[in-house]
Amino acid sequence: MPARPIPVPAFALALALAAALAVPAPAAAARVKELADVVGVRENALYGYGLVVGLAGTGDSERVLFTQQSVAGMLGRLGIRIDPKDVRARNVAAVMVTARLPPFARPGTRIDVAVASMGNARSLAGGLLLVTPLAGGDGKVYAVGQGPVQVAGYDAGAGGAELRKNTPTSGRVAGGAAVERAVDFALGQAPLVLALRRPDLTTASRLAAAVNAKLGAGTARAVDPAAVELSPPPARKDDVVGFLAEIELLEVEADQRARVVVSERTGTVVAGEGVRLRPVAVAHGGLQVRVQRDPAVSQPAPFGAGRTVEATRDRAAATEAGGGVVALPATASVQDLARALDLLGASPRDLVAVLEAIRAAGALDAELEVLE
């Protein structure tokens, strides 16, 4: 008789990945450009209001007053006078246009723009974005967008039936905006500071040490866990770009806090390296979980060259009312705890509840992040 497939709980698959992540391994070094950014060198958000035309009857209805007013205003600038109340075009949609202005973008550079309907248009497919000024937070126009809108979904219907895929009321215009104004930033005139993407005292200290070892003492100073201040040597004052490029290529061993991420909805459990449990006992409904530490002694053979060493042996076990006991290896990790609950058929909700209780008791040496 063929073997019957064994059902796998929702979070069983995630345990393999979590266990692999928890295996101690030498920390990999990363380049500085993956760990930090130069303060002031960043993208800037742009936005604008525009019209998309050429829609096949899927635009805004006459109930969207601002679309009627926008169409009338546009025609008025072209010398055509019309009352907004008389606008009855369903092939026009009012949209909000957004873009990201890259650092050091020069006039003439093309950037992508995103468009999203503001009214009751059903789809922007096949539409054309008219000339739209894109301003920054200071109100100045930095780019102008225009072009055909690409939509990743569709909306079709007839006779009361409707078929929709993805979100056809938003889309993109590839290279649809031309930069008209550059953001003023004089690299080298302002103090040079590297901002860590994941603030950490150890990482900041290691980064400063790596820079000083490469370019000389006093070149870098860790100001706080998130910032490293740079002081170019006198010979590099006029070569700030080369100075920063050399620093970006340095490799630094980044450090981070131990963290456990769980999702109650999917049952996913991800634990990083260094996550451990302290001795604790937890009772949750019919489940009982115990993690304990026993003293042990490593005794060498008689007349051997070794010496007696004291050690500890960590054990964890989980039981269910009316069920058996699942013993774990001589370790006390989140992966072993999750695997024990998995063997007992516990639900993802049970796993999340147990981990939260262990954290509240101070027995989880890591941050616990619960995803929605």
From Swiss-Prot:
Pfam families from the UniProt entry: FlgI
Location in the cell: Periplasm; Bacterial flagellum basal body
Organism domain of life: Bacteria
Gene Ontology CC: one annotated term: outer membrane-bounded periplasmic space
GO molecular function terms listed in the Swiss-Prot or TrEMBL record: structural molecule activity
Keywords on record: Bacterial flagellum, Periplasm, Signal
KW Transferase (keyword) present: no
Keyword Signal: yes
GO annotation terms (biological process): bacterial-type flagellum-dependent cell motility
Signal peptide: 1-29
Main subcellular localisation: periplasm
Entry similarity comment: Belongs to the FlgI family.
PANTHER family reported for this sequence: FLAGELLAR P-RING PERIPLASMIC PROTEIN FLGI, FLAGELLAR P-RING PROTEIN
Primary role: Assembles around the rod to form the L-ring and probably protects the motor/basal body from shearing forces during rotation.
Assembly information from the UniProt record: The basal body constitutes a major portion of the flagellar organelle and consists of four rings (L,P,S, and M) mounted on a central rod.
NCBIfam families the record matches: PRK05303.1
Name the UniProt record assigns to this protein: Flagellar P-ring protein
Organism of provenance: Anaeromyxobacter dehalogenans (strain 2CP-1 / ATCC BAA-258)
